[in-house]
């Protein structure tokens, strides 16, 4: 019987499970949707009960899909960095003013806590050095402060505040252990010192969490992949269709699991892994850009971190990101007048809207006699529709489009789609430049996630950044990264680095363009930067008007 591990990944819209053998070969996967409520603009809520139900169904379905039922020795969980609120009995506590306890999760992308974030950032606290100088409203301490101020009844009822990955391991094991990954990256826990910053929490208005001995936010903190307690409980095993006692690894945030799935893959050009030259790009609803340093911590304005041991023990992690990438591309395409017709045509042909758009771009390039990328010479997009996470770290920024025509045909949609994808790629270039300015020498991007299944997205990122882009052999790299956690917890590998070496492998690579096309992207990148400067100038003009 094949020994196997399970990776569970809870993204923004679905819960997925993957079964892998200990060489990283995928045996089966399954996915189940999860529900989301959006009661106000820039708010997003979910249900932890709904999420756990979807996780259990996905694991059961994946196990049933295996050609031969394997011997599962470990399971790892990753999820979005959403905030879960429970009472002392483990029941959901509402995060919504309407009072529905089923809605007890503030989703990672929710920006309701902007006022709290601005107040915290104005304090200039020392801990902010370890989040790029400024907190994001997507982090947990502003959300906790919002909950305390706006829903005091929920605050009083709450006994547990979990990051979603840690909620999953709690459901699996009954242990309230928190992951070093989640606490360091999203909760301002100082991983390099192994402590909470009491003065910071007290100063911003969360001193009661300190007085309670951190009972509600985590006093048992574990390294990623470390085994939790006695493994799967009898009840969790019954729900998941597995055997009690299976090893459960301490969890990770979903993007960081993707980093585990790609950043350490062996490359033929080098016998060793030079992390200073590698960036892991995890492209989905949003995008995350992970780099690690063996040297002293690198403080990069507008880039989260440096986070100690948040992905690999002993290494410092810096994390750039874009709050909306796949979500932005979907928004632009789905809001166009031709979207309904294109969706119907895709259904009729048995393909996707994006494949049809890519086909249209190929036709347009053929007519023009030039490469696809040059079709957007007069059309430019600033992609900050949901603010800018990195490197400007300003959630108040907004997007822009320059070069629109009085047209709503398929060609118009295809060009707007291409310009948006390119804008996302220029955002990645901006982040890479900020990282390289502080000591990194990034020339290779290891990419995974839903966006990396699109060849237009991949080519745009290679050409815009000038980096070689490497894809993993296993396309479900986030699931594989989570499975590595389960393998390490089960003792199949001594540590995460060994698990990465044994289970992750490189696939094909894409080299960046040079010559005329490189100069074209340099020019468009200059426009990208100027679009932001222009937005700031417009704001100043309006502010002067009173």
State each model region's role.
Residues 1-95, 157, 238-250, 408, ...:
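N-terminal glycine/serine-rich phosphate-binding loop of ATP-dependent small-molecule kinases
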Residues 63-141:
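Active-site phosphate-binding/coordination module
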Residues 17-19, 24, 75, 110, ...:
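Conserved small-residue
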Residues 6-7, 118-132, 145-177, 186-203, ...:
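Active-site core segments that coordinate phosphate-bearing ligands/cofactors
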């Amino acid at each position: 019987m094949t020994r196997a591990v399970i990776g569970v990944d809870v993204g923004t819209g679905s819960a997925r499970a993957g079964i892998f053998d200990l060489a990283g070969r995928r045996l089966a996967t399954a996915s189940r949707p999860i529900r989301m409520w959006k009661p106000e603009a820039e708010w997003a809520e979910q249900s932890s009960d709904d999420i756990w139900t979807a996780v259990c169904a996905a694991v059961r379905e994946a196990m049933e899909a295996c050609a031969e039922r394997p011997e599962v020795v470990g399971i790892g969980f990753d999820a979005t960095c959403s905030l879960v609120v429970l009472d002392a009995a483990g029941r959901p506590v509402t995060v919504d003013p309407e009072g529905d306890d089923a809605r007890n999760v503030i989703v990672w992308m929710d920006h309701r806590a902007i006022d709290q974030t601005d107040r915290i950032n104005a304090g200039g606290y020392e801990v902010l050095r370890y989040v790029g100088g400024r907190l994001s409203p997507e982090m947990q301490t502003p959300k906790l402060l919002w909950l305390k101020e706006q829903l005091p009844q929920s605050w009083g009822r709450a006994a547990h505040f979990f990051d979603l990955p840690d909620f999953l391991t709690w459901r699996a094991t009954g242990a309230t252990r928190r992951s070093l990954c989640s606490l360091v990256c999203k909760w301002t826990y100082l991983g390099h010192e192994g402590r909470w910053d009491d003065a910071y929490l007290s100063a911003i208005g969360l001193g009661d969490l300190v007085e309670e001995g951190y009972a509600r936010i985590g006093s048992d903190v574990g390294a990623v992949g470390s085994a939790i307690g006695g493994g799967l409980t009898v009840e969790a095993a019954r729900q998941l269709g597995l055997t009690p006692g299976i090893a459960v690894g301490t969890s990770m945030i979903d993007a960081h699991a993707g980093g585990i799935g790609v950043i350490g893959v062996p490359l033929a050009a080098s016998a060793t892994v030079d992390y200073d030259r590698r960036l892991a790009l995890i492209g989905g609803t949003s995008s995350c850009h992970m780099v690690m340093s063996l040297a002293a911590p690198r403080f990069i304005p507008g880039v989260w971190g440096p986070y100690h041991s948040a992905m690999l023990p002993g290494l410092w992690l810096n994390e750039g990101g874009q709050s909306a990438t796949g979500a932005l591309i979907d928004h632009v395409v789905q809001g166009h007048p031709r979207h309904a017709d294109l969706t119907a045509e895709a259904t009729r042909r048995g393909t996707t809207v994006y494949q049809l758009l890519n086909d249209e771009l190929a036709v347009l390039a053929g007519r023009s006699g030039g490469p696809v990328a040059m079709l957007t010479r007069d059309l430019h997009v600033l992609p900050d529709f949901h603010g800018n996470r990195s490197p400007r770290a300003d959630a108040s920024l907004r997007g822009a489009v320059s070069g629109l025509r009085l047209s709503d045909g398929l060609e118009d949609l295809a060009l707007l789609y291409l310009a948006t994808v390119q804008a996302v790629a220029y955002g990645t270039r901006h982040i890479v430049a900020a990282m390289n300015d502080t000591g990194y020498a990034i020339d290779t991007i290891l990419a995974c996630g839903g966006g990396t299944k699109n060849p237009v997205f991949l080519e745009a990122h290679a050409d815009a950044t000038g980096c070689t882009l490497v894809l993993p052999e296993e396309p479900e790299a986030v699931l594989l990264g989570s499975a590595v956690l389960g393998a390490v917890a089960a003792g199949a590998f001594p540590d995460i680095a060994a698990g990465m070496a044994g289970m992750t492998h490189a696939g094909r690579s894409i080299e960046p363009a040079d010559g005329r096309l490189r100069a074209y992207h340099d020019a468009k990148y200059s426009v990208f930067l100027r679009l932001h400067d222009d937005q700031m100038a417009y704001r100043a003009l309006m502010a002067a008007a009173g």
